[in-house]
A protein has these predicted regions:
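Glycine-rich, flexible N-terminal cofactor/catalytic loop recognition
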Residues: 1-10, 15-23
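TOPRIM fold recognition
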Residues: 2, 20, 24, 32, ...
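RNase H-like polynucleotidyl transferase catalytic core
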Residues: 29
């Protein structure tokens, strides 16, 4: 499968793994402290062919994703579930994911809206047991996996749901199927 967009990954091992899954060009951030030069490369790539961000499903990966989203408008996001990106020793990274899971993530990219869009507020997430309660974390993980928006804490979940334009009905439907 050939991908037109550039795929942004964290490092060389991620590039090697992604290129085994799909035919593509990659941009490596080389860590979570993205410099202006790398951001400029990503901006140029976005203008020419588009960009898909595929970072590790962990804190540094989320930080990279957030920095890119803040500085480069219109990038798409591909997420791999944390459990699918773990090796036998528990280390998390795109380089540990099965090729089929990488391909699947790239085939189901999400694009956030450029403008603030708030169809869901915090009270809905509380009512649905996604923020408060002993089962909230598990319910968030299920919802995040079904909607393909990556691992999220309560605050991040609200931002992601609104950024990707999900409605209260979308969230309720995804949770109904659990």
């Amino acid at each position: 499968m050939k991908i037109n967009e550039f795929i942004v990954v964290e490092g060389r091992d991620d590039t090697e793994r992604v290129k085994r899954a799909v035919e593509c060009d990659t941009i490596e951030t080389n860590g979570s402290a993205i410099n202006e030069q790398t951001l400029e490369v990503i901006r140029n790539a976005q203008q020419s062919r588009g960009v898909i961000v595929l970072t590790d499903p962990d804190f540094p990966g989320d930080k990279i994703r957030s920095t890119i989203t803040e500085h480069v408008k219109g990038v798409k996001h591909a997420y791999i579930d944390r459990e699918k990106a773990k090796n036998k020793k528990g280390k998390i990274g795109v380089e540990h994911a099965d090729l089929i899971d990488i391909k699947e993530a790239i085939m189901h990219v999400s694009s956030p809206f450029d403008e603030a869009y708030e169809s869901i507020d915090k009270s809905v997430l509380i009512e649905l047991g996604l923020i408060v309660g002993k089962d909230a974390r598990r319910r968030r993980e299920i919802l995040s996996r079904k909607l393909r928006i990556g691992h999220s804490n309560g605050k991040q979940l609200l931002k992601k749901l609104n950024a990707f334009g999900y409605t209260e009905a979308d969230v309720r439907q995804a949770l109904e199927d659990e």
